[in-house]
Amino acid sequence: MTISLRDVTEENFEALMDMELPEHQRDLLHTNAYSIAQARFYDVFVPRAIYQDERPVGFALYNREDDGRPGCYGIYRFMVDYPLQSQGIGRRAMELLIAEIKAQPDVRLINICYHPRNERAGAFYKSFGFVEIGIDCNHEMVAEIRLR
């Protein structure tokens, strides 16, 4: 099984928009359709399709200037299609996403936010080196990786 990150294109965007989360996760994340629209209208967003071999299986969205701060990248969305969760796809995709962001010449910080009661997400992000720094104004947990 080969996991890769690819551009969102005319050929894959419908498959990405059709992906679903289980009922208990739906209130924790915007839809892929919403995220793809955001990326279309705001050029700081970078949408990425997660592929398993030649099949789209998930979606990620990050920005290049979190809250207007150059060098601060924020991972805004990260999801694997519900039937394919818990198979290692998300772990490999997150490794690739973090590596892609770290390869940017100006990066000094990567952050991610999640619902504080989503303990599974918290443990997942901590396993990549994210450190929780507190609750933001939207009542979400903020975690970050400082690089410089």
Regions found by a protein language model. Name each.
Residues 81-83, 87, 116-117:
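Active-site acidic-Proline motif in GNAT/NAT acetyltransferases
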Residues 101-113:
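Conserved GNAT acetyl-CoA-binding A-motif
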Residues 3, 7-83, 100, 134-137:
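Acetyl-CoA-dependent GNAT
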Residues 84, 88-96:
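Conserved acetyl-CoA pyrophosphate-binding loop and the N-cap/start of the following alpha-helix
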Residues 141-148:
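Terminal substrate-recognition subdomain of acyl/acetyltransferases
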Residues 111-121, 138-141:
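Conserved beta-strand-loop-alpha-helix junction that forms the acyl-donor binding cleft
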Residues 91, 116-134:
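Conserved active-site alpha-helix within GNAT-family acetyltransferase domains
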Residues 88, 105-106, 129:
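Short glycine-rich hinge loops at helix-strand junctions in the catalytic core
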